[in-house]
Regions:
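Glycine/Thr-rich phosphate-binding loops that ligate phosphate moieties of nucleotide
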Residues: 1-32, 65-133, 156, 269-280, ...
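Short glycine-aspartate micro-motif
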Residues: 3-9, 60-66, 164, 234-248, ...
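Gly/Ser/Thr-rich active-site cleft segment
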Residues: 12, 135-242
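Short beta-strand-loop/turn "lid" adjacent to the catalytic site in phosphate-handling enzymes
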Residues: 55-123, 139, 163, 168, ...
Length: 462
């Protein structure tokens, strides 16, 4: 019998899931793409499709879900959560009966059927015509502008809604029947909603009673809390994918850092005191009294995919493309040739210089010179990771499992289970125990020197 945590992360285009042991070994990993356009039920079907792939001898000790935000899911007033099992059994046999004599397969099918009536409004869906974020009196909230946009786009659905959930809380609700909003830290309340912001948006923008809007939004609970159970398996309040990745890369003590790179890229460093700099973003850490300073490189991976497509490659053929690009000789000054390899070399050098500027900004502000733990799809490209190290002059650490969100989910679940599974450790120590480094990408001294000279010459002429 293998024991572990079932972790799931709701992405924009796919759901990733993993079964992670208490020692950080990933025994199973799944990635299920969503259809386009994606619906709420597609999230649910992908979650249970990944669940069903687990062998019968895998004992799930807890479930923890992270996801993108601020996506909104409306559950209608006519919805009734299926009876959730209180069985103590942790194995995955569908034949194990739930409370009331309903077996697990029937329970799952009932949840999927109910989800067909729920409405998803993704975080990146365009605002309805005539509405701008700046026009919504939402303060610092990331969610209230999306709720206002949802109200404008789907007024009838909004009027009939019983609850509005973000992604992780929605799936957790379907599993447990517990309607909650998971708060990473009390300092994040303003980024979700404060009562004064709710009242102002309800009365001056939505033109509804403030109590109506307040009633739609589930109450806050602390991330890492056991909010209920699914067939006797504890379900832990998860966090947004950004926070999960910080946990799963160990960016939880002052001076630790990560490079989370997929379709876009975010450099992060944990700092002891709040400090700001131009072109950086300051947010609370999930660890009390600590902070996270970020530098974001928008669409880094997406732009590279578009570049590949424009040159006849598949948009995800990164490794083959990098093999050709790295064969192009380095040019210290002047233009690269008008070939795929030449223009590709120019593209990735330019991208790495942007990353270097981001590292510079974080380090000058924080006073740390950290090793950056890698997370995300770009971490799997060896040639790119080494080139990034050479061009930026930084060291990058590659974990054995580079999907930091899922390791973060596992750490949060073990923390939520308490002393029995968390071994009495705090969240930072649990995460450190789960993260195992496979290799380090360190800058080659000679290459780093010539890239530094080129970078400085570009900076002087910029």
């Amino acid at each position: 019998m293998q024991s572990g945590i079932f972790c799931a992360d709701i992405g924009t285009s796919s759901l990733k899931a993993a079964f992670v042991t208490e020692e950080g070994t990933v025994l199973k990993f799944m990635r299920l793409p969503f259809p386009h356009p994606v619906r709420a039920v597609d999230w649910v079907q992908a979650f249970f499709a990944s669940w069903r792939t687990l062998p019968a001898d895998y004992a799930v000790e807890a479930v923890c879900i992270s996801g993108n935000g601020p996506s909104i899911v409306a559950v209608p007033q006519t919805y009734r959560a299926p009876g959730v099992s209180t069985n103590a059994a942790g194995s995955l046999s569908a034949a194990v009966p739930s409370a009331g004599g309903i077996n697990r397969a029937d329970l799952i099918n009932g949840i999927i059927e109910a989800a067909k009536h729920d409405t998803l409004f993704l975080w990146n869906e365009p605002m309805p015509q005539g509405i701008t974020v700046s026009a919504i009196p939402a303060g610092a909230s990331l969610f209230l502008p999306r709720i206002a946009a949802f109200h404008a786009k789907y007024p009838d659905i909004f009027a009939n809604a019983a609850r509005l959930f973000s992604g992780p809380e929605y799936l957790s609700y379907l599993l447990t029947g517990a309607a909650v909003t998971s708060l990473p830290d009390p300092r994040y309340e303003a980024a979700y909603w404060r009562q004064e912001d709710l009242t102002r948006v309800a009365e001056t923008f939505l033109h509804i009673d403030a109590c109506r809007l307040t009633g739609l939004l589930p109450p806050f609970v602390t991330a890492g809390t056991v909010i209920g159970s699914f067939c006797g398996i504890p379900v832990i309040a998860g966090v947004p994918d950004f926070i999960a990745a910080l946990i799963g890369t160990g960016t939880l003590t002052a001076g630790t850092a990560c490079d989370r790179a997929g379709s876009s890229e975010g450099l992060n460093v944990c700092i002891p005191q709040p400090c700001r700099a131009e072109k950086t973003l300051l947010l609370p850490s999930v660890i009390p009294d600590l902070w996270n300073l970020s530098s974001v490189i928008p669409s880094s991976g997406a732009a590279f995919s578009a570049f590949l497509v424009s040159h006849g490659f598949l948009g995800n053929d990164y490794i083959a493309a990098m093999e050709r690009i790295t064969e192009e000789p380095f040019v210290a000054s002047g233009a690269y040739p008008e070939t795929f390899a030449g223009q590709g070399r120019a593209f990735v050098e330019g991208l790495a210089f942007r990353i270097r500027r981001g590292c510079d900004a974080l380090e000058q502000t924080s006073g740390f010179r950290p090793v950056y733990t890698l997370s995300g799809g770009q971490a799997h490209n060896t040639l790119w990771c080494q080139m990034k190290a050479d061009i930026t002059g930084r060291t990058f650490a590659l974990p054995y499992f580079a999907d930091g969100e899922l390791i973060g989910d596992a750490a949060l679940a073990l923390y939520g289970l308490g002393n029995d599974k968390g071994r009495g450790e705090n969240l930072a120590l649990i995460a450190q125990r789960l993260i195992r480094i496979k290799r380090y990408y360190e800058p080659d001294a000679a290459l780093a020197h010539r890239y530094t000279e080129k970078f400085l010459s570009h900076s002087e002429t910029a």
